[in-house]
Every structure is written in structure tokens, then in C-alpha cells.
Amino acid sequence: MDALIEEVDGISNRTEFNGKKLLDGTETDGFTFQIGANAGQQLTVNIDSMSSTALGVNALNVTDFANTPFDTQLESIDTAINNVSNQRAKLGAVQNRLEHTINNLGASSENLTAAESRIRDVDMAKEMSEFTKNNIPSQASQAMLAQANQQPQNVLQLLR
């Protein structure tokens, strides 16, 4: 039983993410996540201590029922299991909320990208049509100017 209690404490002390211990109860303010674009859109997750002391199983002794009756020790184990189950249920609810938030943010990101694309991207067919429409008068003007410049040359050649 001592080995199991040590393992519970070991898991409680070793479980960490990003340098922060998750299950030892030291993060009393919880873990805060930014889940939206605005400043107030945050989610705080509190994780209770899962150490053997916090769970109430650190003093179990399954070989000595004289000082602590078997029923009392069994109740301690049941209470610890219930505490762990309750914490897992809370974390599962938070996980569902985060997954929902991830899906919403993904849809928002896709919509924002599509809107930006509509603003930035050019309708090539329309723009080529506009270019051609504007280019025809310009080319016609250049051709007329070239012909007008040619006429004095033709007159000079006739006079020679």
C-alpha cells in the first residue's frame, strides 16, 4: 500500500505542463486561458491537489485494522476515488468547452480569411475587360497621331 501511496504522490508531483505543476495544488489561482479575441474572454481552470494527503489516503495501513477499522479505510479510498472522479468530470467539461471554442475560433478565422480574400483579390476577368476597354481608345489615339505626323512627310515627298 505504501508503494501505491508513493506513486499517487509521485504522479501529483511530476505532472506538469510548460513548467507548471498541475496536480500538486500549488497553482491556487488556477490556469487562465485566453479563449477569444477580446480581453474579457478568458477561461480559468482550477485543478485541486491530487496528492495522497489531499485525497486522504496518506495514512492508510491495510495491515493494521486495530487502530483504523477496515470500513473506515475503505471509506477513505472511496472518498479519494470520488474526488478524483469529480476532478476528472470538471476537467472533461472544461475540455469540451475548449474544443467548442476551438471550433468557433476556427470558423471565425476561416470567415475572416475569406473576407480578406474578397477585399484583396482581384476579379481577373473583370479587370482584363476594363483594361481592354480603356486600352482601345489609347491605341486609337496613338494611331491617329502617327498618321497625322505622317501627312506632312508625305506632302514633303510630293514636293521633291
From Swiss-Prot:
Keywords attached to this entry: Bacterial flagellum
GO terms for MF: structural molecule activity
Additional information: An N-terminally truncated form of flagellin of unknown function.
Homology family: Belongs to the bacterial flagellin family.
Location(s), subcellular: Bacterial flagellum
KW Membrane (keyword) present: no
SUPFAM superfamilies: Phase 1 flagellin (SSF64518)
Cystine residue pairs: none
A Pfam entry, by short name: Flagellin_C
Keyword match Calcium: no
PANTHER family, per database record: FLAGELLIN
Predominant location category: other
Self-association and partners: Interacts with FliW.
One GO cellular component term: bacterial-type flagellum
UniProt-recorded name of the protein: Putative flagellin YvzB
Consequences of knocking out this gene: Cells lacking this gene form dendritic (branched) swarms more slowly and arrest prematurely on B-medium. Swarms normally on LB medium.
